[in-house]
Swiss-Prot record:
Protein's UniProt keywords contain Cytoplasm: yes
GO function term, MF aspect, one: ferric iron binding
Family: Belongs to the FdhE family.
Name of the protein this chain belongs to: Protein FdhE homolog
Sequence segments annotated as region (Disordered): 1-22
HAMAP family, sorted: FdeH
InterPro entries in alphabetical order: FdhE-like_sf, FdhE_C, FdhE_central, FdhE_N, Formate_DH_accessory
Keyword 4Fe-4S: no
Localization in the cell: Cytoplasm
GO biological process assignments: protein maturation
GO cellular component, one term: cytosol
């Protein structure tokens, strides 16, 4: 099964209603609390952590996103997007035209971060500030196409933070509802076509259900458990953790495609957060690489040094 977003009136015309016990195929981010909760979790994890300085840096970027979101709300009419997108995600990163709002967000993020920045971070922010719009657009396109270069990795978290904020704002404005339909490509976000940062096994009304968290638009989409989130095979899956079987963070590996994705279990620790806990558990990534598996996801604060397939 795949997930499509359709106009609300189309569901009503087809007589579709939400039955009792229905599994929500898609969860849009609550932007009022997303960034503040993430920043808080990053700062919690930073305490006595070997990567504490970087987690604190990431928290600062996320807090800047929260401020910029408040100061620069997106006003965009997306009423025709759902009917024009066809079988594609409505905000597909491969074809959706970016407007200059994302550059406004980037400039605002730089302005917000510069006063407290120093050293390499300050130098990177100043270089971004001096860059032409064409250079920034080219770097943004490269990131969205997963064309990574080590020499640009210092700029990537800031550019991605602006792009993510732009796409998250657009996702919140989509005038439609999601439904599960026959199809493939469940490994890609049904809103924007990007890939997950991690999977979250949830509590509450969605208790026990696995949702993949988009690393760009922050949406979450349902993916059944005990199935590889990358190739959808289920015959050769294993689960890895660093401490115990009851760990709140595990890596699900697939022997069929040779990749892994981290899963965060809210029932084990209700505080786990898709980006923060993934970033803070890099030791598990090292372990998985030693076992011969490749990461199928990308964290917005940790980009590969070279392009991936």
């Amino acid at each position: 099964m795949s997930i499509r977003i359709v106009p609300q009136e189309q569901l009503e015309q087809n007589g579709k209603s939400t039955p009792e016990g229905h599994i929500p195929p898609l969860l849009f981010a609550n932007l009022k609390s997303l960034y503040s909760s993430r920043a808080e979790r990053l700062r919690q994890l930073a305490a006595d952590h070997p990567l504490g300085d970087y987690l604190t840096f990431a928290a600062g970027v996320v807090e800047a996103q929260q401020k910029v979101l408040h100061d620069h709300p997106l006003q965009l009419d997306l009423s025709n997007v759902l009917t024009q997108s066809g079988e594609r995600p409505p905000l597909d990163i491969a074809v959706f035209p970016r407007d200059r709002h994302w550059l406004t967000l980037l400039r605002a993020l730089i302005e917000e971060l510069k006063p407290d920045a120093s050293g390499q971070v300050l130098s990177t922010l100043e270089n971004l500030e001096k860059a032409s719009e064409q250079e920034l657009e080219e770097q943004a396109t490269a990131l969205l196409q997963h064309e990574f270069h080590a020499e640009n990795n210092d700029k990537a978290p800031f550019i991605w933070a602006a792009l993510s904020l732009f796409w998250a704002q657009m996702a919140s404005l989509l005038p439609g509802k999601a439904r599960a339909v026959p199809g493939e490509h469940r490994q890609f976000c049904p809103v924007c076509g990007s890939i997950p940062v991690s999977g979250v096994v949830q509590l509450g009304t969605s208790s026990g259900l696995r949702y993949l968290h988009c690393n760009l638009c922050e949406s979450e989409w349902h993916m059944v458990r005990v199935k590889c989130s990358n190739c959808e095979e289920s015959s050769d899956l294993n689960y890895w953790s660093l401490d115990s079987e009851n760990s709140a963070i595990k890596a699900e590996s697939c022997g069929h495609c040779g990749t892994y994705l981290k899963l965060l279990y809210q029932e084990k620790d209700h505080r786990v957060e898709a980006v923060a806990d993934d970033l803070a558990s890099l030791v598990l990534d090292v372990k998985m690489e030693e076992e011969g598996f490749s990461r199928s996801s990308i964290n917005p604060f940790l980009f590969p040094e070279s392009s991936i397939e």
